[in-house]
């Protein structure tokens, strides 16, 4: 991770995402994600397949190993609601939820105007994946969300 543990432990929520090295071998990319999942300060893995619709295909990652690690460590996977990402896609979100992974819908908004406009796309992915409120982190009541965030700290 790019930040020291001393900084990460001060944050309310830590989302780790791959933002470089997309052309690495699948094993390397998979291990980067698994190591991030295993990190005690990481709560959510952002855009787990790295795809950008119409621009970049998902990177070569073993999503089943990523899901297994997320289950084992209690790390959530993101449904990135940006209309240019929609990552995780519905079928992978369903697979993750069936395995016991918590999902988090994130707008990936880069300005306040995108908050509401993007969220509907993420909700649509979650619905297509047949996710219930118990499987989506940011539908939880505040006390439950705070308990979930405190579980590994």
What spans do the regions from the language model cover?
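Charged catalytic cores and adjacent phosphate/nucleic-acid-binding surfaces used
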Residues: 1-153
């Amino acid at each position: 991770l790019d930040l020291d543990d001393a900084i990460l432990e001060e944050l309310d929520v830590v989302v780790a995402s791959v933002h470089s090295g997309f052309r690495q071998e699948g094993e390397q990319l998979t291990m980067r994600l698994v190591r991030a999942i295993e990190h005690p300060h990481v709560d959510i893995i952002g855009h787990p397949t790295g795809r950008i619709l119409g621009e970049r295909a998902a990177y070569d990652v073993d999503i089943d190993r990523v899901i297994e690690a997320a289950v084992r460590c209690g790390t959530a996977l993101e449904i990135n609601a940006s209309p240019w990402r929609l990552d995780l896609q519905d079928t992978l979100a369903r697979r993750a939820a069936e395995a016991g992974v918590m999902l988090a819908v994130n707008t990936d908004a880069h300005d306040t105007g995108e908050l509401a406009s993007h969220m509907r796309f993420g909700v649509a992915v979650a619905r297509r994946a047949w996710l219930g409120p118990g499987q989506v982190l940011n539908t939880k009541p505040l006390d439950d969300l705070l308990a979930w965030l405190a579980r590994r700290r």
